[in-house]
Amino acid sequence: MTLHSNSTTSSLFPNISSSWIHSPSDAGLPPGTVTHFGSYNVSRAAGNFSSPDGTTDDPLGGHTVWQVVFIAFLTGILALVTIIGNILVIVSFKVNKQLKTVNNYFLLSLACADLIIGVISMNLFTTYIIMNRWALGNLACDLWLAIDYVASNASVMNLLVISFDRYFSITRPLTYRAKRTTKRAGVMIGLAWVISFVLWAPAILFWQYFVGKRTVPPGECFIQFLSEPTITFGTAIAAFYMPVTIMTILYWRIYKETEKRTKELAGLQASGTEAETENFVHPTGSSRSCSSYELQQQSMKRSNRRKYGRCHFWFTTKSWKPSSEQMDQDHSSSDSWNNNDAAASLENSASSDEEDIGSETRAIYSIVLKLPGHSTILNSTKLPSSDNLQVPEEELGMVDLERKADKLQAQKSVDDGGSFPKSFSKLPIQLESAVDTAKTSDVNSSVGKSTATLPLSFKEATLAKRFALKTRSQITKRKRMSLVKEKKAAQTLSAILLAFIITWTPYNIMVLVNTFCDSCIPKTFWNLGYWLCYINSTVNPVCYALCNKTFRTTFKMLLLCQCDKKKRRKQQYQZRQSVIFHKRAPEQAL
């Protein structure tokens, strides 16, 4: 005579439904077992009774009180940190406009998935571990599994989207960034969630209806179609190993591209310093004259430097020898020198900008110098090579074209009666804007045709050169800022990817081992591995804070409740500025 408990026992005091059994074998007990009620060591506090299906109704699942306290405390802290951290991410995105970038939209989606895991998955799985059985019924079990797997797979899909976004942003900055809008980011995020839902939710919720029966035993909770190790192995390959492989390859490409751009920027800065030194006009003695030989030597130096860098430079050389009446006119030679340098500087800036946009075409820069007597337009336009220069023969008076195909000679009269033979090397400059010379000369015969530029004075050419160097420095600064942003984004991606691999790998390794040896891994290891996957949701907000200063300062502001103080300080500052303005207004009126 023995006793077995009803399956619907209370958690603390079970409702005992006694039945008398005439033999020990009827109860599944070994022979010789005393089948007297008093022979059982019944603990009313623990309620250790076995149901016919073999499940245990012990609310502590065979754990001691201290074990339960430790498990509940540790998992509770992790769940709380996960919830708070991801709520901080969502609220920070809401309150700080600086965080509303396309890249952070993906992080926002990832934070939503992590928040679901922290609120639902962690707590239910902890209850399952402590009680050592599922006590909430089949429907709650299937809903929990569906939410858990959809949110976890959405995290993986979001990481994939972030990796591809970073990769295309760095490798295709011109074409991809034009299409990289918040609307497109929302579409990508929506697709990640829809794909995750379609892959897991219907199969988990309705598989028992597809096959006609439910094979999950009472008191247990797992996905029915994953009961076969081979199916579990296949899902592990598709849900973890393939995404991790793709993300690792993409991150490696991102790292190599970032390193290459860093070297290019260093070379650009070095060439910029060298060009600035070479382009500086050094007066020699009492004259600033410069012969065509010196200009050709300078061009050869620049062409040699061109071979060692990725930035391609095209230079123009204009020189002339002053006539006997103009030997004392010091500014003529300096005009030639500075005109050469100004055009060269413009080409430098155009070439560096070409590297910035990552295009094979030449960026267009036009610098218009409106001078008292004339205006000069220097254009750097799209030309695939420097051999396509076409200059009208009527304007430049082409001489000896067959023998010297790389030089064009022309003569142009100016109002003081002097003439300047000009020699032009092959240029990537298409002279298409007529020079306005109405105030200065009688060269009206060139109306409607392209013409060569007039020589600039020393002061004017210096201004043009300074402007070109400033443009170059601005381009370099923009490239540096863009590179810094890309590095920060790559650091955030690397931290998230590393955390994902560390936390998800142990469980998926056990899945592979279980395919060949289903009894080699203890249940405790399974629980730890599964919980470690949840910890990834705890670590992600920490990665954002460590790698992004804006996130870090916003987190601090929210945790210290400084939002209202910041608004008040801003309002007080605006009020002070308004008072100062009103005080100064009467004084200025006087």
Swiss-Prot record:
Residues 334-345 have a biased composition (Low complexity). Residues 1-67, 131-142, 207-229, 515-526 are extracellular. Residues 92-104, 165-184, 253-491, 547-590 are cytoplasmic. Disulfide bonds join 141-221, 517-520. CDD domains: 7tmA_mAChR_M3. The keyword Glycoprotein applies. It is a multi-pass membrane protein. Glycans are attached at residues 6, 15, 41, 48. The chain crosses the membrane at residues 68-91, 105-130, 143-164, 185-206, 230-252, 492-514, 527-546. One of its GO terms (cellular component) is endoplasmic reticulum membrane. A motif (Basolateral sorting signal) lies at residues 275-281. It is found in: Cell membrane; Postsynaptic cell membrane; Basolateral cell membrane; Endoplasmic reticulum membrane. SUPFAM superfamilies: Family A G protein-coupled receptor-like. It holds the Pfam family 7tm_1. Belongs to the G-protein coupled receptor 1 family. Muscarinic acetylcholine receptor subfamily. CHRM3 sub-subfamily. Homodimer; the dimers can form tetramers. Interacts with NALCN. Interacts with TMEM147. PANTHER family: 5-HYDROXYTRYPTAMINE RECEPTOR, MUSCARINIC ACETYLCHOLINE RECEPTOR M3. This is Muscarinic acetylcholine receptor M3. It comes from Pan troglodytes.
